[in-house]
């Protein structure tokens, strides 16, 4: 199985097969999840100082902040041409 990567904005990529959820950052439970990840040094901020539009939860407990809308990231995940392949 080839490892696939997903562009989450500004040249940042994550491993596509390790994503559990892509959610909006607006709800209180997601805000709590982001704060807990920050406190446990498991937060990766890929926004380059811009507004967080999507929160990506990874299978290893890391939480990734992205400046791209969740719908756009999901579309990229479902669109095979948008994924980069290793090797």
From Swiss-Prot:
Q: Which family does it belong to?
A: Belongs to the RemA family.
What PANTHER family does the entry give? REGULATORY PROTEIN SSL2874-RELATED (PTHR38449:SF1), REGULATORY PROTEIN TM_1690-RELATED (PTHR38449)
**Protein's UniProt name:** Putative regulatory protein BCAH187_A3920
Q: Which InterPro entries match?
A: RemA-like
């Amino acid at each position: 199985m080839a490892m696939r990567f997903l562009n989450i904005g500004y040249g940042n990529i994550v491993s596509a097969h390790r994503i559990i959820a892509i959610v909006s950052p607006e709800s209180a439970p997601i805000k709590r999840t982001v704060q807990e990840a920050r406190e446990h040094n498991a937060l990766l901020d890929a926004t380059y100082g811009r507004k967080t539009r999507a929160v990506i939860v990874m299978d290893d407990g890391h939480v990734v902040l992205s400046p791209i809308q969740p719908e756009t990231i999901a579309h990229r995940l479902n669109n095979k041409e948008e994924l980069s392949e290793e090797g």
